[in-house]
């Protein structure tokens, strides 16, 4: 059984604005320790990690109010990757004229893990992101007369890169990645509105040190073209993970010192 773990990194707000509340800082360190402990314990049992970083919403005035929409965004990204066709009950056999590249769970697992010589298979740490664009004007829902829009897929790729789930991520450090385009059938046929899959593939390969990109195209019944991406890194290549690890070690050292004093 293949296992993908979704790991959540706590927001460490004192790196943005220094906290005047020592209890808040200690709570942040403790959350970092919990997150690091969970990730390291799971590392030997999972095939890959998708990292969700709460630092991404920590800049908001009311961070707690953002959790619901942030969770919905992450859930939509994951659902698009693993069950988009099933959720919309689309049978690709109904479109025999289309033969798009397909992504399955094997591709996702390959994109999320590393096979190191001498060390065997190890989980990677991935950031996930999604961008979408509507294919017609609002008026078209009432009077379906206007033409469908041509979608700037390169713009979608850049937007998805900006909406990654890990804060301060450097895509130039990415080892491998995956991209799934979902579009109505008419956008997969050769025409003036057909999507530019080549441009997306070039963008993704450019942001892969291994030149490894898993590209797939899937159908949707919605008037929407979406791009969902995974960028996979080694643990050491993610600054936020290293920051959480350092905070966890600091908390552990403080706890040991406090225990020694009390004893």
Enumerate the predicted regions with their spans.
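Tubulin/FtsZ superfamily GTPase core signature
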Residues: 1-263
């Amino acid at each position: 059984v293949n296992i993908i773990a979704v790991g959540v990194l706590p927001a460490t707000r004192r790196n943005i604005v220094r906290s005047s509340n020592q209890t808040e800082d200690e709570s942040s360190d403790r959350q970092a320790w919990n997150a690091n402990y969970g990730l390291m314990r799971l590392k030997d049992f999972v095939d890959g990690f998708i990292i969700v970083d709460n630092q991404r919403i920590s800049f908001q005035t009311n961070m707690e109010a953002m959790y619901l929409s942030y969770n919905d965004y992450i859930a939509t990204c994951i659902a698009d990757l693993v069950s988009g066709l099933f959720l919309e009950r689309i049978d690709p056999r109904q479109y025999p004229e289309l033969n798009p590249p397909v992504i399955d769970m094997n591709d996702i697992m390959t994109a999320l893990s590393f096979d190191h010589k001498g060390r065997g298979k190890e989980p990677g740490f991935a950031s996930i992101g999604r961008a979408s664009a509507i294919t017609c004007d609002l008026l078209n829902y009432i009077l379906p007369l206007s033409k469908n829009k041509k979608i700037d897929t390169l713009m979608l790729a850049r937007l998805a890169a900006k909406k990654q789930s890990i804060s301060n991520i450097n895509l130039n450090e990415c080892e491998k990645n995956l991209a799934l385009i979902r579009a109505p059938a008419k956008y997969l046929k050769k025409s003036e509105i057909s999507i530019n899959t080549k441009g997306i593939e070039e963008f993704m390969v450019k942001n892969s040190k291994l030149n490894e990109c898993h590209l797939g195209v899937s159908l949707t019944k919605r008037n929407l073209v979406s791009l969902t991406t995974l960028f996979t890194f080694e643990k050491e290549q993610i600054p936020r993970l290293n920051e959480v690890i350092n905070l966890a070690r600091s908390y552990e050292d403080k706890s040991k010192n406090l225990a020694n004093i009390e004893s």
